[in-house]
């Protein structure tokens, strides 16, 4: 911790992140005891500003938390009406019938939602119960007690100059202390990353795996719109270059969510995930749907894909990791929000019981037991082998092997046991000389768009006078190692055009970080083959401003 003197505020529970996990925890705590002092700190300009998800929501988490959510006006307005799955070739598609799919793949009873709007509604429910929610409050540091337990966080520091010195409007922020601190920052949160390393919470676990999810909202011709229709695809354009797939969700008001996910364990450093997404929209099936329509929003976010075997230990003295800070996405279902909500509820119940017993700043072991042995663990354990089988054997073989494994897991066993993930996504990156460059067609400005134009539809903004929140452990590595060895992959894997290599006045290569473009996806922190880029929080309120993602 720095030597800066700060004011302090005391709470029973301090929650970092107003996503589905953090808000569920806050709501459940106040349901259990209205007198508990609970605060939620959100780095976005408002609740929902940094929320990006598909999303087809399994309402089981909401059912458990707020059983009368329908009566209370939760924005779950579009039930899934039909479910389609296609294998794509470059010029055609093959529909996979639903009947051989394991039952867990069925979307009956689920809803197409904007998770940003769901979180905004959840925040209203939390505030009605007396939860304090502070948006625009980036949490930049953990606060530790003398015994090594987590004591709280530093939030609200802003006004630094670009060199890190205090500017004329500098505010040091505050220390918010709690009997327990919940980290619900989403995927690859900077504080969760620190806590996992400090307490060695990943010891004995498989490496976490990730995907990069990119999403656009389109307004399309009403004649083509089918409210409640859900489509997923695999195959082209990724084929054998990488794992991943797409989603097309028809919500209301003639709007469609069009998204594309690239698994970040791809080997070819020439691969350009954003351009794979843009190319996907030119497939005849997709182009026919979108032609004549208008893209109205864009965003990107990393997704945790490691599943059951990659979940770290979730508790340390005084702190618990919730939701995607742990990694609770069911990869074949492409769903994690329900588990995030259930994790928040479980953490709240464990903390409430501890506080009732007069405890504080210890390990909430009951929470971890609930997650691993309860509904979340059951959901993730059944599908634990799908991602590693895909990585090891490719798309076609893994569809058969993974499908078979999911079927046997519904009966309580697996012939595969638990398959290892192997390398981290950064370690999986191959050398440029060992892989062929990939030629991507130029965006046409109608169906496909250049990256910087699309980033403007994320409404991202960062105060330019502050220190860059994207830092390098060694400033020489991008040019001395990553460029000659991997052809500078950051200039391609970033979906916002943050990184580029330019020539300086002497004609030498120079690495440039355009941090103002950042949409907080965290891909650079994950995929950089040298693990040299570190994502930290900018000052509060900065970043994307997603309206309905």
Which residues does each PLM region occupy?
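C-terminal auxiliary extensions adjacent to catalytic cores
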Residues: 390-446
């Amino acid at each position: 911790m720095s030597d800066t003197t700060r004011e302090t505020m005391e709470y029973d529970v301090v929650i970092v992140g107003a996503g589905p996990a953090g808000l569920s925890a806050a709501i459940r705590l106040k349901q259990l005891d209205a007198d508990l002092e609970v605060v939620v700190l959100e780095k976005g300009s408002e609740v929902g500003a940094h929320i990006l998800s598909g999303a087809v929501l399994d309402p089981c988490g909401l059912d458990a938390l707020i059983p009368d959510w329908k009566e209370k006006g939760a924005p779950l307005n579009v039930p899934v009406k039909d479910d389609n799955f296609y294998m794509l070739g470059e010029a055609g598609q093959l529909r996979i019938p639903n009947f051989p799919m394991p039952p867990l793949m069925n979307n009956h009873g689920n809803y197409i939602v904007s998770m940003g709007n769901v979180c905004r509604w959840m925040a209203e429910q939390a505030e009605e119960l007396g939860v304090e929610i502070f948006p625009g409050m980036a949490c930049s540091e953990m606060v530790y007690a003398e015994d090594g337990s987590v004591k709280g966080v530093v939030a609200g520091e802003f006004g630094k100059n670009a060199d890190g010195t205090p500017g004329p409007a500098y505010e040091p922020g505050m220390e918010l202390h709690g009997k327990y601190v919940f980290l619900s920052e989403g995927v690859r949160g900077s504080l969760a990353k620190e806590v996992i390393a400090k307490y060695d919470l990943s010891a004995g676990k498989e490496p976490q795996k990730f995907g990069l999810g990119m999403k656009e909202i389109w307004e399309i011709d009403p004649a083509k719109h089918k409210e409640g229709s859900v489509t997923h695809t695999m195959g082209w354009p990724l084929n054998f270059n990488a794992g991943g797939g797409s989603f097309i969700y028809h919500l209301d008001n003639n709007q469609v969510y069009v998204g594309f996910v690239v698994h970040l364990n791809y080997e070819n450093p020439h691969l350009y995930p954003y351009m794979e997404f843009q190319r996907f929209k030119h497939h005849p099936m997709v182009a026919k749907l979108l032609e004549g329509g208008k893209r109205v929003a864009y965003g990107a976010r990393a997704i945790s894909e490691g599943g059951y075997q990659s979940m770290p230990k979730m508790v340390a003295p005084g702190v618990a990791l919730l939701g995607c800070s742990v990694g609770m996405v069911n990869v074949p279902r492409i769903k994690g929000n329900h588990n995030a909500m259930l994790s928040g509820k479980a953490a709240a119940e464990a903390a409430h019981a501890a506080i009732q017993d007069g405890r504080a700043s210890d390990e909430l072991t009951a929470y971890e037991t609930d997650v691993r042995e309860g509904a979340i663990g059951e959901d993730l354990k059944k599908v634990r082998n799908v991602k590693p089988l895909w990585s090891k054997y490719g798309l076609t073989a893994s569809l058969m092997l993974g499908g078979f494994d999911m079927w046997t897991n519904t009966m309580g066993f697996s012939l595969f046991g638990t398959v290892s993930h192997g390398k981290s996504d950064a370690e999986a990156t191959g050398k440029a000389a060992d892989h062929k460059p990939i030629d991507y067609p130029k965006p046409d400005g109608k169906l496909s768009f250049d990256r910087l134009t699309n980033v403007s539809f994320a409404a991202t903004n960062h105060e330019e006078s502050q220190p860059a929140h994207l830092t390098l452990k060694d400033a020489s590595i991008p040019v001395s190692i990553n460029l000659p060895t991997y052809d500078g992959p950051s200039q391609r894997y970033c979906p916002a055009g943050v990184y580029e290599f330019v020539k300086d006045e002497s004609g030498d290569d120079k690495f440039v970080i355009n941090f103002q473009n950042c949409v907080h996806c965290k891909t650079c922190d994950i995929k950089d083959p040298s693990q040299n880029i570190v994502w930290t929080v900018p000052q509060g309120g900065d970043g994307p401003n997603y309206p309905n993602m």
